[in-house]
């Protein structure tokens, strides 16, 4: 097995409304890497990022690469965009006037000072990316017919949104979705360092879901051109969450495998082989050589210096937006 450390995505309140993209990279992602190195006693660790978490993780590793550090033994990116050339329906919500409006209302340019993007607004935006399934279905069933929606773990996830600090959100919108600068070596400066994702030397495993409405799989495939080292692309069935959370024991869905990485996503798919079942087994086989020798599992979490604070999953996970 693998010793796993999970970083909670904190739901910020007004006291954190001024936090920037640099803050999230330096004081969240990079600090988490440092602490895992210290607790595990390892110079290199396997790293994984999901969606925007993957964008943050890749940015952090590029910052560290600029400082002469390569802390990742491997990098796994799940439904992550680094090249924002193909962002799907989200393009309808993001243009120059829309980003400017955010910058002067909740960003660093706001006369009232930075504010929060409310989680409810974020959740509504994502729901309207799939209105038939996530909006009108419940208008008819719940409002018109008085039916109670059945318990559903993915629906719970969809409703469990988070606030975001305005400056962080505005930087992300402008430099990724609007201007697509993250993929360009040396174009952006983060935490005082010129970014070059190609400087990350770790082997990369990129996963995308075929029916993903948030991160279109062809957009995720474009990230294969960003990295210069060894990389593997995996396409799974279903959507943004259901495609990722697909344990092998369930024997559900399928995935597509292709050892080659042609320039075109369509060409990759045309020559790919469909394999029944979960993609997890492929990833586990890929990850195993990067994990180092087997050791005895720790009996308790943390160390003398880094003591456990409370039982998992921790208070941040339970906070409501």
What are these regions (language model features)?
Residues 232-321:
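Catalytic active-site module of serine/aspartate enzymes centered on a nucleophile-bearing elbow/loop
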Residues 38, 42, 56, 60-169, ...:
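Alpha/beta-hydrolase-fold enzymes
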Residues 200, 206-208, 212:
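Short beta-strand/loop motif that positions the catalytic acidic residue
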Residues 211-215, 240-241:
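Acidic catalytic loop of the alpha/beta-hydrolase fold
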């Amino acid at each position: 097995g693998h010793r796993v450390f999970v970083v909670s995505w904190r739901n910020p309140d007004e006291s954190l409304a001024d936090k920037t993209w640099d803050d999230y990279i330096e004081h969240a992602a990079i600090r988490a890497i440092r602490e895992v190195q210290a607790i595990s006693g390892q110079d290199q660790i396997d790293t994984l990022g999901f969606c925007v978490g993957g964008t943050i993780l890749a940015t952090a590793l590029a910052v560290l690469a600029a400082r002469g550090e390569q802390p990742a033994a491997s990098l796994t990116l799940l439904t992550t965009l680094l090249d924002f050339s193909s962002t799907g329906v989200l393009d309808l919500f993001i243009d120059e006037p829309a980003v400017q409006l955010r910058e002067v209302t909740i960003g660093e340019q706001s006369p009232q000072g930075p504010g929060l993007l409310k989680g409810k607004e974020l959740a509504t935006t994502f729901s309207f990316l799939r209105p038939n399934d996530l909006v009108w279905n419940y208008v008819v069933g719940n409002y018109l017919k008085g039916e109670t929606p059945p318990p559903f773990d993915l629906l719970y996830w969809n409703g469990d949104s988070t606030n975001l600090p305005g400056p962080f959100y505005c930087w992300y919108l402008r430099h990724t979705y609007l201007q697509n600068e993250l993929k360009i070596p040396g174009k952006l400066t983060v935490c005082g360092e010129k970014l070059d994702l190609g400087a990350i030397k770790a082997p990369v495993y990129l996963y995308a879901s075929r029916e993903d409405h948030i991160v279109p799989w062809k957009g995720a495939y474009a990230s294969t051109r960003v990295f210069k080292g060894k990389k593997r692309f995996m396409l799974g069935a279903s959507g943004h969450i259901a495609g990722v959370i697909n344990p092998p024991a369930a024997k559900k869905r399928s995935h597509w495998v292709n050892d080659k990485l042609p320039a075109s996503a369509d060409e990759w798919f045309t020559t790919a082989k469909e394999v029944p079942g979960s993609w997890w087994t492929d990833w586990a086989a890929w990850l195993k050589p990067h994990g180092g020798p087997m050791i005895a599992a720790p009996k308790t979490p943390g160390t003398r210096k880094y003591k456990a604070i409370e039982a998992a999953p921790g208070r941040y996970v339970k906070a409501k937006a």
